Design a protein with these regions (language model features):
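Intracellular innate-immune signaling modules
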Residues: 1-648
């Protein structure tokens, strides 16, 4: 039980442990419609969730995930819990086990076997039986017989997104005997499907991108951890910070920055913010209080690397060496899509595996080394956002210190090109920061799942003067101010040309990191004065409208097309409708009276509504000739998750 009673915020077996029951803040968990895959960067998903009211969802307590809701009578064997990185999935597992061990909850379960995928990965090449697998992880089970219904057993597989096994649910290999040997992936597949121990309960956690790796027919309930809701955010800071007046100041500061407060849905970000702001505000440190994500993460990095100077390691390793090696690891694994690493990954980046614990000690809260039940080492950064910040810092320092554009190093196809480019990179030709930024913008825009979105925001934010002052120990020279001016202009040009609302929204976040708010402020003036109807907006200005409407202090409630365009100008109304579809799908009331929606426009509208059917409550289509498109609307209304109350 000792393994689960303490919470090491942000770190494993290092730092200051806190009793879980003292700091635990109930997370907002709901039943989700499916385990379908999400191709959005998790930052976008957090922003989307922050805009949606929670009142219509039925919350589920962590300890109740295997209990049917009122009106549900089918037994629940397998639960899939999804949620973005750092949202609290693993802590929920820890709390579930602790409450069970303390005989508070779920006492009908006799045995719980927590099997994190990052530890199971270490045995991916082994052939053994399920009994043998349990004996390896839990030696005390050697005297137990779990092949029958004598025990009610729960298996917890935490971190499906970290799985490096080949889980083939189409395989014909069928195992029904716990003493029969097979590869570990076959064992797990048969256990999840129900061939092995069909009476056992199964709990799988995953980030959204991997949620569909387990077929839906094998899952009886899908839940989603949404992190902290508004009251829970404040509760966390009041528990975490003993000085309540300081806690109030920190909460007020975070609320003043929309981009920071949105991130507070993620418990790990609350911990990062508390670490930084408590130190800066309580110790009267000089310098600007962080208002952007980059500022917050850079301050956090500095606080944690300063631990180094309290230890004896500085004789062997400089800050720059340590940061560059970890940053290189972060960047390479980000490009590959990996969030956990093994010994071979460290070696590729010049990190001596025998010194890994030293790196872990130097960056206590940033990089962690874990020893699982099975003898082996697993490495990861505390949170994906820390991973992305270090990757961005590596790319930035490679350019400013070593005149290298690292994007040129990941696109080489032949040995000849590598050798040729090595000479080019080590020539006197200058690699400008604006060129690096433009390349990074293009790489991020080309990403299908937006996996470089936050990395890009960090990379651009690191070039701001205030950041260069903070990082002066690491930087050989500062960048020129006109580099950022060129980057700002390049981003504004890109906003005019891209069709994806999600990608344009991220570019506005990038402008925010660079300190440029001109487009947004211009649109805010139009909206406040009511002159937006008369204004002839450019495509980039309409993108700014979407950004402003989707990042308000209050959640969206009503969208009326006539607030944005003169009534009876149907051509312009249709044009505006197309541009504001991202806003429409986040609105509870959509008013499209007399706007001449054509079949083409209606097709786009129903597509937007279909992507978020449970949110819309009122739809007004009065005065539009719907025609054949009525079938599209019918499909939306028949969706099981549609909660439309009023249609006109």
């Amino acid at each position: 039980m000792k393994k689960f009673e303490c919470l090491y915020e942000g770190t494993a077996k290092q730092g200051n442990p806190t009793l879980l029951n003292e700091i635990y803040t109930e997370l907002y968990i709901t039943e989700s419609e499916s385990g379908e895959i999400s191709n959005e960067h998790e930052m976008r998903q957090i922003e989307t969730q922050s805009r949606r009211a929670a009142t219509e969802d039925t919350p589920i307590k962590c300890n109740d995930i295997f209990r049917p809701l009122p009106g549900q009578d089918k037994p629940i064997r397998t639960v899939l819990t999804k949620g973005v990185a750092g949202i609290g999935k693993t802590v929920s597992v820890q709390k579930f086990i602790l409450d069970w061990a303390e005989e508070k909850e779920n006492q009908d379960v006799q045995l719980i076997f927590p099997l994190p995928f990052r530890e199971i990965n270490l045995m991916k090449d082994k052939t053994l039986s399920l009994s043998d697998l349990l004996h390896v992880f839990f030696p005390e089970t050697k005297e137990m017989e779990i092949s029958n219904d004598k025990y009610k057993v729960l298996f917890i597989f935490d971190g499906l997104d970290e799985c490096r096994l080949s889980l083939d649910f189409q395989s014909d290999v069928r195992l029904c005997d716990v003493s029969e040997s097979a590869s570990v992936d076959v064992l797990l597949m048969n256990l999840i499907v129900g061939n092995l121990l069909p009476s056992a309960l199964i709990w799988i956690t995953s980030r959204p991108a991997a949620a569909d790796l387990v077929p839906s027919e094998c899952v009886h309930r899908v839940t989603e951890v949404r992190g902290f809701n508004e009251p829970q955010k404040e509760e966390y800071f009041r528990k975490r910070i003993s000085d309540q007046s300081l806690a109030n100041i920190i909460i007020t500061h975070l609320k003043s920055s929309r981009s920071l407060y949105i991130m507070c849905h993620i418990p790990v970000f609350c911990w990062i913010s508390a670490t930084v702001l408590e130190k800066m505000l309580s110790e009267a440190e000089t310098g600007e209080i962080p208002k952007t994500l980059t500022q917050m993460y850079t301050h956090f990095l500095i606080i944690q690397t300063n631990i180094k100077h309290e230890k004896d390691y500085e004789k062997n390793m400089t800050d720059e060496d340590m940061i560059l090696k970890l940053g290189k690891l972060a960047f390479q694994q980000l490009v590959k899509g990996n969030v956990i690493f093994y010994e071979e990954d460290l070696r590729e980046c010049g990190i001596d595996v025998t010194e890994a614990s030293v790196y872990s000690g130097l960056c206590t809260q940033i990089f962690r080394e874990e020893f699982g039940w099975y003898q082996g080492k697993v490495f990861c950064f505390v949170h994906l956002s820390i991973h992305e910040h270090l990757a961005a810092l590596y790319v930035h320092l490679s350019c400013t210190n070593n005149n290298i554009n690292v994007f040129d190093l990941i696109t080489k196809q032949s040995l000849l090109s590598i050798v040729t480019d090595w000479f080019q990179l080590n020539s006197s030709e200058h690699v400008s920061l604006s060129e690096l930024h433009q390349r990074a913008v293009n790489e991020a825009l080309q990403s299908k799942n937006g996996h470089l979105d936050l990395f890009l925001r960090f990379l651009l934010g690191l070039s701001v003067k205030s950041q260069q002052i903070l990082l002066q120990r690491l930087m050989k020279q500062t960048s020129r101010s006109n580099s950022n001016e060129e980057t700002v202009e390049y981003i504004k040009k890109k906003i005019k040309t891209i069709d994806s609302p999600e990608k344009s929204i991220n570019l506005f976040h990038c402008l925010n990191e660079l300190g440029d708010h001109s487009l947004v402020e211009e649109i805010q003036q139009y909206l406040k004065s009511g002159r937006i109807k008369e204004a002839k907006l450019s495509s980039s200005q309409w993108s700014a409208v979407v950004f402003v409407l989707l990042t308000p202090e209050k959640k969206l409630d009503k969208f009326d097309i006539n607030d944005f365009v003169v009534r009876d100008n149907t051509t312009e109304q249709l044009n505006v409708l197309q541009k504001l579809l991202p806003v429409i799908k986040e609105s509870r009331s959509v008013q499209l009276r007399d706007c001449g929606v054509t079949d083409e426009g209606f097709s786009a509208l129903t597509s937007a509504l279909r992507s978020n059917p449970e949110h819309l409550r009122e739809l007004n289509l009065t005065g539009n000739k719907i025609g054949k498109s009525v079938n599209l609307l019918s499909d939306v209304l028949q969706n099981l998750h549609c909660k439309l109350e009023k249609l006109r």
